[in-house]
Regions:
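Internal, conserved structured core segments that host functional sites
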Residues: 86-146
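Single conserved hydrophobic/aromatic residue that forms the stacking wall/gate
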Residues: 172-182
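Metal-dependent nucleotidyltransferase catalytic core
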Residues: 17-20, 61-101
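Helical scaffold of the NTase/Pol beta-like nucleotidyltransferase catalytic core
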Residues: 1-38
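Alpha-helical structural context detector biased toward long hydrophobic helices
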Residues: 136, 159-161, 165-171
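Membrane-interface amphipathic segments in extracytoplasmic regions
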Residues: 5-12, 31, 61-62, 92, ...
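Short, cationic low-complexity segments
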Residues: 145-159
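Active-site nucleotide-donor binding segment shared across nucleotidyl transfer reactions
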Residues: 25-58, 67
Length: 183
């Protein structure tokens, strides 16, 4: 969560998030793309059957194969009120994953307020690569990837500050010959 919201602001934000999620699910179901909720979204679904009252986003995950399929079909399948934001469609995005954003809405994260990218309210879509079956190995992989994420996000912010570009994202939005390094 980036800031404090009033209850009314959160209600409006949650309504938009559910709308975006519904459209994302529609596309996934039409194309037989399995997905799963993650992070705070999973906790909210488990305990409240809803978005956590204080949460300002929804996170879903897909295997890399399904993520790539989603990236291929979503630009044509999403309704006109939605936009698939990732490095191919929103070249200034500093993110290494995709977002389904709602047009004609505004949600700008403070650290990216000067980045010329689509400003809409969004649902995050994360690719999952080479997930180990072993619980300990999954934990190690998760910690390593969390560290890598922090390094990348810091690098991206620095790059925007100094160069106004984020070419490093290309390394992490498509399959890599290094896939499986941690498994």
């Amino acid at each position: 969560m980036n800031k404090k919201y009033t209850a009314e602001e959160l209600d409006l934000l949650h309504a938009e998030l559910y709308d975006i999620l519904g459209e994302t699910i529609r596309v996934c179901q039409k194309h037989n793309i399995p997905y799963f909720v993650i992070g705070g979204t999973a906790i909210g679904a488990l305990y409240d059957q809803a978005v956590l009252p204080w949460d300002d986003d929804i996170d879903i995950g897909m295997t890399r194969e399904n993520y790539n399929k989603f990236l291929k079909v979503a630009p044509e399948e999403l309704g006109p009120s939605y936009f698939l934001s990732w490095i191919e469609t929103d070249p200034h995005t500093p993110y290494y994953f995709a977002k389904v954003k709602k047009n004609d809405t505004l949600f700008v994260e403070e650290m990216f307020k000067n980045v010329p990218m689509h400003p809409g309210i969004f649902v995050d879509i994360f690719p999952f690569d080479k997930i180990p079956d072993n619980k300990l190995l999954r934990r190690i992989q998760s910690e390593a990837l969390g560290f890598l994420k922090c390094c990348l996000m810091g690098k991206e912010i620095w790059m925007w500050k100094h160069f106004g570009t984020c070419e490093i994202c290309l390394l992490y939005t498509s399959p890599s010959p290094r896939d499986g390094l941690l498994s």
